[in-house]
Curated annotation (Swiss-Prot):
GTPase activator for the nuclear Ras-related regulatory protein RAP-1A (KREV-1), converting it to the putatively inactive GDP-bound state. Residues 585-613, 661-670, 699-712 have a biased composition (Polar residues). GO terms for cellular component: centrosome; cytoplasm; cytosol; nuclear membrane; perinuclear region of cytoplasm; plasma membrane. Coiled coil: none annotated. Residues 635-647, 678-687 have a biased composition (Low complexity). Residues 248-464 form the Rap-GAP domain. It comes from Homo sapiens (Human). Residues 618-631 have a biased composition (Basic and acidic residues). It is found in: Cytoplasm; Cytoplasm, Perinuclear region. This is Rap1 GTPase-activating protein 2. The lineage of its organism: Eukaryota, Metazoa, Chordata, Craniata, Vertebrata. Pfam families: Rap-GAP_dimer, Rap_GAP. Changing residue 7 to A: Abolishes phosphorylation by PKG/PRKG1. It comes from the Eukaryota.
């Protein structure tokens, strides 16, 4: 039996001899010594016989490292140190090392480019400014070949279309928004061209298309699609307004700026802080000479030219400033030393509020001193032109120029020469003013200013489109209503509501006409709450004792004028009066006596079952009348045989009525009613030979002039009723 001992290991090898473990340690040590990494950089892994706590702790450390790597990968970009952004040392370190100093130093965290032939920080992808240069024909010998950069589309309409034969079109509500297109045919060197300007809310496109090889001119939608692939299925309308050209040229040139304001900051030797720059009050002779080169020193009080935001009335922004005109443009300079100085204000806000709101500024350096673009905190300053005088005090001093701007600002001309040194004279002034003007135009293309410009362009384009459309329709003699129906527009909620009301009124009138024709012999059921008519005709009978006679008159037309349920008739009669102004039915108040004795009759007004009926009584209390008769009791008349007469049919219903003494009416002057009993067969009292049917006859004030008083008719008929009842009893 072998006497070799074995040791237990928690590694992945199970049972391992100690001799084998020792040999593994030796090999691992040799590998560690042979590698380039040092022991602290590359620690040895724990031995295979290490306790589990030691291996688990290293395992968790490895997990933490892996999680840290994953978190770094999930970040938008690698976190760089300040040294990764600084191509030069900080300005304090540069000043401590001593001169000569560079003119411009990139800020610690970047964000700017420097135009310098020897500097790799100048952006090369942009190449040149996106602004188009003016035509060379406009350049004079005094410009020294320096061109002003501006948007060619802004002046194209005035240069090529205004005052010449051309056509304008507008498109409403496309996927690209409102569009306005101008087209003109022209010929150059024997070749025909089609010059087109297409305006959208995003941009304005100006192109010249050759027509060689085309059998006919392309249509306006085809021209629009040639400029933009998304312009599909568009419908253009011609602009028919004599003054449309002036409106279009005003829109195109809203981006053209003929007034500029630039800041001028005086930087002395070894000044590296914003407070130090704005705190300078003295002007050196070299700085005064430079200001004289820029323009004329003017007095602000009552100044009539472009003031650039300075006070010309109360003198709150200083006494003097520098002003000049350049190629039909006005320029006002905000000179830091000429703006008001406030004692005790380290930031000098009276100066910074003007220079800080400028877009381009000049940094004049008295001596060789570095400048950092982020030295001045401002949201508007996007470009700086640094000018350093090299030979001050001489008759023709020289100036060294450097240009820096933010990264989102495209490059602008004229380019700096190599070396960038100019002699004092008209050429340097021409270069400097041209560079300043082009710098501001280029800064307007940066992200911050471009968003503002896009919103302004879209609003102005929509306004121009609406005005052209309105004037075109006015020239055609089309109003807003005709224009909407012509274009198929619904006109909004209000127009839809008006049309619905008109259709409803027309349908109501048609229904009323049909009701009159179908119910010419009786009462319309819709007016009495939907009550069905009996087969027998409505009769009107006078009492002639002792024999009851009925005279039947056929009506040639309906006695009821149907009124719309939307506008029920208003009752203005007083509620306190005792006269009944509603349809009433006679009801027996006491049971009939066997011997045919006296019975009292109570007549109560009933409310119609139709709430929209025009004859509804507004009184809640039911007025009643009691009639004592010696004759037989009058049975309650059926509602199916009751008839209602309105003001429209009253004339025919009252033709055979007996006339009585006229009495003043106590009812409302707007409506008068007559209560008439006409005997007719009743289904409820078959034993009686005749039953009294009450009839409500309404009278209007107009009919009362030619008719007898309804109150007298009521009294006369009640007298006849009493006389007939007494005669039958005897």
């Amino acid at each position: 039996m072998f006497g070799r001992k074995r040791s237990v290991s928690f590694g992945g090898f199970g049972w391992i001899d100690k001799t084998m473990l020792a040999s593994l340690k030796v090999k691992k040590q040799e590998l560690a010594n042979s590698s380039d990494a040092t022991l602290p950089d590359r620690p040895l892994s724990p031995p295979l016989t290490a306790p589990p706590t030691m291996k688990s702790s290293e395992f968790f450390e490895m997990l933490e490292k892996m999680q840290g790597i994953k978190l770094e990968e999930q970040k938008p970009g690698p976190q760089k140190n300040k040294d990764d952004y600084i191509p030069y040392p900080s300005i304090d370190e540069v000043v401590e090392k001593g001169g000569p100093y560079p003119q411009v130093i990139l800020p610690q965290f970047g964000g700017y480019w420097i135009e310098d032939p020897e500097n790799v920080g100048t952006p090369t992808s942009l190449g040149s400014s996106i602004c188009e240069e003016e035509e060379e024909d406009n350049l004079s010998p005094n410009t020294f070949g320096y061109k002003l950069e501006c948007k060619g589309e802004a002046r194209a309409y005035r240069r090529h279309f205004l005052g010449k034969d051309h056509l304008n079109f507008y498109c409403t509500g496309s996927s690209l928004g409102n569009l306005i297109l101008s087209v003109k045919c022209e010929e150059a060197e024997g070749i025909e061209y089609l010059r087109v300007i297409l305006r959208s809310k995003l941009k304005t496109v100006h192109e010249r298309i050759p027509l060689a090889g085309l059998s006919k001119l392309p249509s306006v939608p085809q021209i629009a699609k040639a400029f933009c692939d998304d312009a599909v299925g568009l419908r253009f309308n011609p602009v028919l307004y004599p003054k449309a050209s002036q409106m279009i040229v005003s829109y195109d040139e809203h981006e053209v700026n003929n007034t500029f304001k630039f800041g001028v900051i005086y930087q002395k030797a070894r000044q590296t802080l914003e407070e130090e720059l704005f705190g300078n009050n003295e002007e050196s002779p070299a700085f005064k000479e430079f200001l004289d080169l820029l323009g004329d020193t003017i007095t602000l009080q009552d100044f009539k030219g472009f003031r650039g935001g300075l006070d010309v009335t109360h003198g709150q922004t200083g006494v003097e400033s520098v002003y000049t005109t350049f190629r039909d443009r006005e320029i006002m300079f905000h000179v830091s030393t000429k703006l008001p100085f406030t004692d005790g204000d380290a930031q000098q806000l009276q100066r910074k509020r003007h220079i800080g709101n400028d877009i381009v500024a000049i940094i004049f350096q008295e001596e060789n001193t570095p400048f950092v673009p982020d030295m001045i905190a401002s949201n508007f300053l996007h470009a700086y032109i640094v000018v350093q005088v090299e030979t001050p005090g001489t008759e023709t001093p020289s100036y060294k120029v450097s240009v820096t701007a933010r990264e989102d600002v495209p490059t602008f001309g004229p380019p700096l020469p190599s070396p960038p040194v100019f002699q004092k004279g008209p050429e340097f002034r021409e270069f400097l003013l041209t560079k300043l003007t082009n710098a501001e135009n280029a800064c307007c293309k940066s992200d911050k200013f471009a968003k503002l410009e896009d919103r302004t362009r879209a609003a102005l384009l929509d306004n121009l489109h609406d005005e052209l459309h309105a004037h075109t329709q006015a020239m055609l003699g089309l109003g807003p209503e005709e224009d909407k129906f012509e274009n198929g527009g619904h006109g909004g909620f209000l127009e839809s509501f008006k049309r619905a009301i008109r259709v409803r009124s027309h349908s109501m009138e048609t229904m009323v006409g049909g009701q009159k024709k179908s119910h010419s012999g009786g009462i319309p059921g819709s007016l009495s709450g939907g009550i069905s008519h009996n087969s027998m005709e409505v009769t009107k009978t006078t009492f002639s004792p002792p024999v009851v006679a009925a005279t039947v008159k056929n009506q040639s037309r309906s006695p009821i004028k149907r009124r719309s349920g939307l506008f029920p008739r208003l009752h203005t009669g007083s509620e306190g009066q005792g006269d009944s102004r509603a349809r009433c039915d006679s009801t027996s108040s006491t049971p009939k006596t066997p011997d045919g004795g006296h019975s009292s009759q109570e007549i109560k007004s009933e409310t119609s079952s139709n709430p929209s009926s025009p004859e509804i009584c507004p009184n809640k209390e039911k007025p009643f009348m009691k009639l004592k008769e010696n004759g037989r009791a009058i049975s309650r008349s059926s509602s199916s045989t009751s008839s209602v007469s309105s003001t429209a049919g009253e004339g025919e219903a009252m033709e055979e009525g007996d006339s009585g003494g006229s009495q003043p009416s106590t009812t409302s002057p707007f409506k008068q009613e007559v209560f008439v009993y006409s005997p007719s067969p009743s289904s409820e009292s078959p034993s009686l030979g005749a039953a009294a049917t009450p009839i409500i006859m309404s009278r209007s004030p107009t009919d009362a002039k030619s008719r007898n008083s309804p109150r007298s008719n009521l009294k006369f008929r009640f007298d006849k009723l009493s006389h007939a009842s007494s005669g039958a009893g005897h």
